[in-house]
Amino acid sequence: MKGLIARFIAGFALLLWAWDMVFPWQQLMQAEENRYNQIQQRKILRVGMVNHPLSYFIGAEGTAGIEYELAKSFANYLDVRLDIKTFDNSEQLFSALKDNKVDIAAAGLLYQPELSKQFQIGSAYYSASWQVVYKKGSNRPYKLSELEGDLIIPAGSAVLPILQRLKEDNPKLSWQTTNQFTQEELLLQVAEGKIPYTVGISVDISAAQHIRPNIAVGFDLTDEAPVLWYLPNSSYSELQAAVLDFMNHANETGLISRIEEKYFNHLAHFDYVDIQSYLKAIKLVLPKYQSLFEKYRGDLEWQMLAAIAYQESHWDPNATSPTGVRGMMMLTRDTAERMKITDRTSAEQSIRAGSEYLHMLMRQIPETVPKEDRIWYGLAAYNMGFGHLLDVRRLTRQLGGNPDNWLDVKKNLPLLAEKRHYSGLKYGYARGFEAFQYVENIRRYYSSIINHQRVEEQQIQNNEEQPSVPQEISKESDSTLKE
């Protein structure tokens, strides 16, 4: 009997030990598996982000960015409210995800094997790579061994685990970190020659080159990797299933394509000379006419009206083309008479008439076209005529596309110059390929003005707070050297 009791006690103790070992895991699993239910119960989706010019920012028109638009759509998909929580860097963001302070980490984060062991991942929505950058005209680095101590990165950057892994095969690799500058600010410091090298994500570098064209890529630090959301870790998660379902839905409905078109497509074309000339004009010429663009902007942002005028005339009120169009907005004589202006070379008259004419065209665009795309339809009509815009909408429908989807319409613009297509259209031949490029150029110019202003304002603020480059990121400083 004593032996039986002893065995029972021993067995019970073993059971308690096993329960103690398993219970925390069960608790964790319970919490993770219920994360989706928690979101539904509180009716709030908490998404962690880092302020960033492509991912998440608050601009003149309100909150925007790739991650914001995706997260907002996901919250709508779940029928809950979106709560954005911002962090200074990726390290803080992942710490918050681990501590259950956010439900999703969304900050233009590339897939990393180390992180996938700690967190669940969602579907990829674009891909990018880490690259080493230097100032155009200075010594270009070609390999890791040339970076010794001269590489500056932000503290808490997502690239740190990558550098630590690379150091295993490259023992001389070293870098310095700074708490005082963001990744974008370090890219700009490279452009100004204040620091020799930094790293950035390829799409961020492309965006930065449109405001600082002397930023150049030395070499790829990594291969291209998917950009995705990170979720709390567990062996199974309803939240992960919901994210995967949403991303499939976003692909099928064209949401991902529309977001890529909005934030990425205008970055594909990079002309060093053109951008240099444009940035010079922003500094020297634009201030003369900015008040007029603001005065006559109507429903547009004044920066958009300025971008149109630059595409038309490079902000030259006396510009003339061989076809007879003249002035800041390059108006035809017929359009000038229609808009009741007497002097096409008057900057004010031309800007006013051009804006009013564009607004008139946009009012004719069907209400079924989404609000954010109406400007692109209007610009295409401004360039080639409203009749040809109607034609390309008809052609898009004939070819199985959606005439209310700018992505579908714009790819068919060049077809207006092909006889097999224009011969069956009401308004016939049009130089649709020019209209396509016209809209793309304006998108690029508009983005550059917005980003140039944002960077200038940030630099003024930084100069007031920090008049010189802090010692913490100077080459002489050893206090921040990280291995």
UniProtKB/Swiss-Prot annotation:
Q: What class of enzyme is it?
A: lyase
Kindly list the places in or outside the cell where this protein is found, as annotated in its UniProt entry: Cell outer membrane
Q: Which residues cross the membrane?
A: none
The signal peptide annotation in the UniProt record is 1-18
Tell me if Membrane is a UniProt keyword of this record. Answer: yes
| Annotated segments matching region Disordered | 458-483
The UniProt annotation puts the region (LT domain) at: 269-483
Q: Where is the active site?
A: E312
Q: Which GO terms describe its cellular component?
A: cell outer membrane
Q: What is this protein called?
A: Membrane-bound lytic murein transglycosylase F
Please report the organism this UniProt entry assigns to the protein.
Actinobacillus pleuropneumoniae serotype 3 (strain JL03)
